[in-house]
Design a protein with these regions (language model features):
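Extreme N-terminal starter segment of soluble prokaryotic enzymes
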Residues: 3-7
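Structural motif
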Residues: 8-10, 105
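Active-site glycine-centered loops adjacent to acidic/histidine catalytic or metal-binding residues
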Residues: 11-12, 109
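Short active-site segment of divalent metal-dependent hydrolases/proteases
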Residues: 14-15, 199
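Short hydrophobic segments within beta-strands
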Residues: 10-11, 62, 158
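Alpha-helical cap/lid subdomain in secreted, periplasmic
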Residues: 82-214
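Conserved SGNH/GDSL esterase-like catalytic core that processes O-acyl groups on lipids
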Residues: 25-120
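Catalytic phosphate/metal-binding cores of nucleic-acid and nucleotide-processing enzymes, i.e., regions
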Residues: 8, 40, 185-188
């Protein structure tokens, strides 16, 4: 069985489930269905299936429905909820001061694609908050920041299917630049753009197949 050790997940709606993400974070999946989905048990989620089929311990599922990696979301500035914004907030709050992370999973980019967040240009140093409102700068910053904070951590990026090519290409480029891993999902079943039970099974299967081949 693949050993992932202590796992941190940074994601969007695809990785949420009510009661299993930080309080106040928006979710798509509930015990009592409230969205267009048939997923109503946490055991049906892709991430729980992956955890249950590996040697792993979840440190935190820091997933927030509707969020972009960069600071530009559907209504403009989303710097408090964005992937980089909330990760930086957790770091600044000292949450990691007594935590160990062996595997850091980033599953995002879907909302950057859907919200038409600015793509921008690659930036590999000198980031400021103002530079992180575009996707390419933010995704490079995020991967580098994680690696700097957790030397030797295994960073696994997951990208959705059917996104703008510049979103997928940008994540692939950033992963290659910093030695992170990338899983590119294929042909996932969805309802209203979100994986249903079958889609969750497909994501878990593709992730587990990737892990077992490494």
């Amino acid at each position: 069985m693949v050993d992932l050790g202590k796992v941190f997940i940074l994601g969007d709606s695809y990785s949420t489930f009510e009661g299993h993400i930080p309080e106040g974070y928006a979710t798509w999946y509930y015990d009592v269905i409230q969205k267009d989905t048939d997923v109503d048990k946490v055991e049906q989620t892709w991430w729980k299936k992956v955890l249950d089929n590996t040697e792993s311990e979840l440190v935190l599922n820091c997933s927030y429905s509707g969020t972009t990696i960069c600071h530009t979301g559907y209504s403009g500035d989303c710097s408090k909820a964005s992937f980089v914004g909330r990760f930086d907030d957790i770091v600044a709050d000292g949450w990691f001061s007594n935590k160990t992370v062996d595997t850091f999973i980033v599953f995002g980019g879907t909302n950057d694609s859907w919200a038409n967040s600015p793509i921008g240009e690659v930036m590999t140093s000198g980031w400021t908050k103002e530079t992180l409102f575009s996707y390419l700068r933010a995704v490079n910053y995020l991967i580098k920041r994680v690696q700097d904070l957790f030397p030797g951590v295994r960073v696994i990026c997951i990208t959705n299917c059917d996104l703008k090519p510049e979103i997928t290409d940008g994540l692939r480029d950033a992963a290659e630049r910093y030695g992170a891993e990338l899983i590119e999902l294929q042909d996932i079943e969805k309802r209203s753009g979100h994986p249903d039970i079958k889609g969750m099974e497909q994501i878990a299967e593709q992730v587990l197949n990737y892990l077992e081949e490494r």
